[in-house]
C-alpha cells in the first residue's frame, strides 16, 4: 500500500501543469501463470488490480507511474494450492519522437524502474513455508499508438535488465539469487474514447522471465499471460 500512496501523491502536481496532458486509469485483470521450475510445471491463476497515471509534458517528455497488486494461487504437482500475493511499482520515463499529427502514429521510447515483491505460502516437507521474492529491473522499451476515430491501438515492447532477483525461504535457510539478467514483455492495448475525457481500455500482456540460481542447479522459467480491462480519465 505504500507504493499506492506514493503514486497518488505524485499525480497531484501533474494535473495542474498547463499545455500538457494527464490520464489516470484503473484496471482489473486475470493472469495465467505458466512455465516450469526445474522438472515441475507452473500453473497459476491470479486476479489483479492496477492504478496507472501518465503525463505528457508540452516538451514531449512522458512520465508514467503504476502500481499493481496480484493475488491468487499456484497449483502444485500434488494438487495443493498455494497462497500467492505480489506488489509491483513501475516507473516509465520516455520521449515522444513522433506524434499522430506528424506521423500518423505516436512513437515513444522509454526507460524506467520496476520494483516487484511477491510472497508464496505453501506446505512442504511437513512445514508451512513462505517463498519471498524481490526483483528490481530497468526496462528499455518502445510504445507505439495508432488512431482511427474513437478507437486507438497500441503495442508496447520492452526488455528489462534485472539488477536484483532474489528468492528466500527463511524457515529452510534458503537464499538464492538469479544469474539470468533479462526479462521480456509485450503488451497490446485497444482503447475506445467515450467522450473528451473518459475512455475504456482492454490490454493483453505476455511476459517471460528466467531464474537461474547462481550457485546451484535450479532453473525456472515463467511465461505469464494477462488480460486487463480498465476505465480512464483524461485531464
Walk through the language-model features, giving the residues of each:
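Short glycine/proline- and aromatic-enriched beta-strand/turn motifs that initiate or cap beta-hairpins
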Residues: 17-77, 149, 232
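Outer-membrane beta-barrel "beta-signal"
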Residues: 93, 192, 222-235
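Hydrophobic, lipid-facing positions within transmembrane beta-strands of outer-membrane proteins
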Residues: 24, 47-51, 87-91, 136-142, ...
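Flexible, solvent-exposed loop segments that connect beta-strands
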Residues: 34-43, 69-86, 114-135, 161-180, ...
Amino acid at each position: 500500500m505504500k507504493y499506492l500512496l506514493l503514486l497518488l501523491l505524485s499525480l497531484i502536481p501533474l494535473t495542474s501543469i498547463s499545455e500538457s496532458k494527464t490520464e489516470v486509469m484503473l484496471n482489473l485483470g486475470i493472469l495465467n501463470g505458466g512455465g516450469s521450475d526445474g522438472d515441475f510445471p507452473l500453473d497459476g491463476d491470479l486476479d489483479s488490480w492496477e492504478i496507472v497515471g501518465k503525463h505528457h509534458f508540452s516538451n514531449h517528455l512522458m512520465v508514467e507511474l503504476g502500481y499493481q497488486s496480484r493475488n491468487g494461487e499456484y497449483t502444485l504437482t500434488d494438487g495443493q494450492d498455494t497462497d500467492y500475493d505480489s506488489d509491483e511499482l513501475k516507473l516509465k520515463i520516455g520521449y515522444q519522437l513522433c506524434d499522430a499529427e506528424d506521423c500518423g502514429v505516436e512513437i515513444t521510447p522509454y526507460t524506467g524502474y520496476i520494483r516487484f515483491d511477491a510472497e508464496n505460502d505453501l506446505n512442504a516437507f511437513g512445514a508451512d513455508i513462505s517463498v519471498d521474492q524481490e526483483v528490481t529491473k530497468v526496462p528499455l522499451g518502445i510504445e507505439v499508438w495508432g488512431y482511427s476515430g474513437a478507437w486507438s491501438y497500441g503495442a508496447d515492447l520492452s526488455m528489462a535488465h534485472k539488477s536484483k532477483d532474489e528468492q528466500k525461504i527463511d524457515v529452510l535457510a534458503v537464499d538464492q539469487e538469479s544469474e539470468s539478467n533479462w526479462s521480456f514483455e509485450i503488451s497490446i492495448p485497444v482503447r475506445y474514447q467515450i467522450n473528451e475525457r473518459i475512455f475504456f481500455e482492454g490490454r493483453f500482456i505476455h511476459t517471460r522471465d528466467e531464474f537461474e540460481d547462481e550457485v546451484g542447479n535450479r532453473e525456472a522459467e515463467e511465461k505469464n499471460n494477462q488480460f486487463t480491462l480498465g476505465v480512464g480519465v483524461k485531464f
